[in-house]
Amino acid sequence: LADHNARAAAGSRVELSIAVLEKGSEVGAHGISGAIVDPRSLRELFPDKFSAIPFEAEVGREHLWWLTQEKALSLPEPPQLKNHGNYVASLGKLVKWMAKEVAALGVDIFCEFPGRTLLYEDTAAGKGRRVAGVRTGDKGIGKDGKRKSNFEPGVDIRSQMTVLGEGPRGTLAKQLDSRYGLSAGKNPQVYALGIKEVWELPQGRFEPGEIWHTMGWPMWPDHFGGGFIYGMQENFLIVGLVYGLDYENPLDDPHLEFQRLKTHPSIAQLLAGGTMSYYGAKAIPESGYWAMPKLGGDGFCLIGDSGGFVDGQRLKGIHLAVKSGMLAAESIFAAALAGKPLSSAGDAYPVHFESSWARQELWKSRNFHQGFERGGFDAMVNAALGTITGGLGFGLFDRLPAEAGHERLRR
């Protein structure tokens, strides 16, 4: 869309006004450092500037460990976990670089503008109401809920098309789901907690781009998840744990399990003499294709985690989030070229997704997470048979049912 505007400025087309609302104090404020990025969508988005993207390093040495409480057994990586050709990246650095690129093309970025509620208006055909923009949150509200001297009321930002990339369980996306039933007939979305720490270690402890993934202790066989360690530049190391929130025991503590993971002899040896610099955590939508909500409608699109664009089998979602944004933009661009209302792109966007490589990737892992409801051993069998059969559950079923995470909790 920004490229369309650049050409429109030359007089060939009507220019569109594009704005990004960022709830953080700056772009990247909510991006937790350290991730492995499949570069496919970024190569498509920045074909002439790909070499300028500030990745930390291309993935080099890869390790997969099966952990017992005292030992680390090296395993061969299954196809889904092989990362040759992928990159270790700081998500904060990546999105800041992208923000500069789009700002240079005339996109307005407004930081510290959280969306509080959606705006609606009657459709021209009189067949209901469409999304017509966002009302931002008030500023200058005290802890007691009263207005302070610096109070500023929220503003109404009207738009023909509203694209929501709020992450999992976003405020506005939940409003849309409640109003339009976007998740009707879908599997329930199940979440995991991704916990990360950034460590600064002595020189020579690891190579930038060196990565580890762990299975087994301290979670096996009752919990979905595993550990990860990524080597970055300047002796910084990412260590983290993905912990499924669909556990049965109400006393489970994901943060405590992460601390236990770091006491494993092989990991403790890696971290010895280092300093923990940063900490963060975020929710991850893990249920896959069958839990994705309806992705668009009159005046709106859902992208990234808001739309469930995560491949749990590959442990990746950034490239899918980028591709979902591209598909939404292409749908809006097509509506503009055809002289149609931009709001109509919300219906075209899901169709474009279904014919994209992003859909093909998510289709292959459509039954991956459901296998973990039956325990770790069944999950491994399901994953292996799904790989052979193109994603069939246990090699037989096109769609495995799923339980919401809270329904599995013992009371």
Tell where the protein language model's regions lie, with residue ranges.
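Active-site-proximal substrate-binding core of FAD-dependent oxidoreductases
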Residues: 11-16, 308-314, 326, 330-379
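Flexible, glycine/charged-enriched surface loops at secondary-structure junctions
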Residues: 269-280, 340-346
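FAD-binding beta-loop-beta segment adjacent to the flavin cofactor pocket
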Residues: 281-312
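Ferredoxin-type iron-sulfur electron-transfer modules and their immediate structural context
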Residues: 54-59, 64-68, 358-411
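Predominantly flavin-linked oxidoreductase catalytic cores and closely associated redox partners
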Residues: 3, 11-15, 19, 23, ...
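Redox-cofactor-proximal catalytic regions of oxidoreductases
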Residues: 26-33, 39, 44, 57-93, ...
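N-terminal FAD cofactor-binding segment of flavoenzymes
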Residues: 4-7, 11-70, 172, 360
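Glycine-rich phosphate/pyrophosphate-binding beta-alpha loops
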Residues: 88, 306-319
